[in-house]
Amino acid sequence: LGELAAAGAAVDDGDDMSRLYIRQGCYELTPSGTFSDPGPLAAYQASRPFLEYHLRRRVADLATVTILDHREVTEPLMTADTVTGARIINQTRAVTSTLDADLVVDTTGRASRTHAFLESHGYGPIPHDRTPATWGYSSQLLRIPPGRINERMAFINQGNSAPGVVLMAYEHDTWMLAISRPVKSGGPPKNFTEMLETAHRILPQAISSALHDATPIGNIASSRATAGRWRRYDHMPHLPHGMLVLGDALCTLNPLYGQGMTVAGLQVLALRNCLQEGDFDIVRRFYSAAAKHIAPVWKMNHVNDRPADPNPRLPVRLRNGIQRAALRAATHNIIVTERLLRVRGLIDPPQRLQDPTLLIEILATTLRNPRRKTARSIG
């Protein structure tokens, strides 16, 4: 992390709420004070190419790692009930060879074909859970003169029927502007002008005014690929030894929530722990461990993406009421804000929002402060 900072990544130490602008629904999370444990909330913000360059360099320096460039895996290799390696092709010389392995890990993301490979070898279809693509988004890399924006990030989520905005500082005075919009409201903005119009309507004037001085870098990127898919390898009664999938190849989340790399990192830690315990039944143990990390995030996203029920049942009304009370309290109380950010950042599990001491804090804050809405949803 120190190397990323030294190379120019934007750093927020997590100890100053003035560096963040967060609006959830109609509530601005702008309490005064400092977090009790700012370290886990520190953010090192950089573009994906910047991050991947530095990660690859660090990994390549490891004595136990060899990177084979310009190779493509064409298919895994099997004997009996075990994957023993992969067939690869050298793209520069068009030469095919085999690479033996005790464990093959598929991290090819959304394009993974492991499920099709397993089905073609008689293991049956892999069951999966899905959430629909109800959003689209557009993003644009910008260069903004230093000092024009005090915050390092602005995040606005107005709910599932109004546009959302993320503006995030990157390395070397570059910023990423992303605008999300429900498909039923027209989908992602089609050009930078449309993005700016939406941003100016939603962002605070002190932030949006800086966008007048922004210089676009490259073209906007638009996507409607916001569906979620969790391939339930953990539900399979039988799988071959020696092969597993990880990251988006296992579970693709709605990218608007910004959880993909964190959940993939948690899966890597789960795999490390499984390997440290030995290779016996490693595939099944890994999928079971990974599911424990994925399940609460998947459930939380499913609830957030679900259309509002006009006649919710009592448990749903209670949950929604607690969520609104927590957000309202977070506009005043740094303790509540810290807990919300820790859960959103997957540092703490969602169950921490049901902690009795937190509920008491929310109640006390609500009683001390009159109900007020600080902003309204803007279409």
Residues covered by each model-derived region:
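Short, conserved secondary-structure transition motifs
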Residues: 137-145, 221-222, 290, 296
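C-terminal helical "tail/cap" subdomain of flavin- and related membrane-associated enzymes
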Residues: 272-379
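Primarily hydrophobic membrane-targeting regions of prokaryotic envelope proteins
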Residues: 53-60, 72, 106, 118, ...
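N-terminal FAD cofactor-binding segment of flavoenzymes
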Residues: 1-27
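Short beta-strand to alpha-helix junction loop
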Residues: 38-57, 107, 113, 189-190
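Helix-loop-beta segment of a Rossmann-like dinucleotide-binding subdomain
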Residues: 29-48, 85, 179-183
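FAD/FMN-dependent oxidoreductases across multiple families
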Residues: 185-293
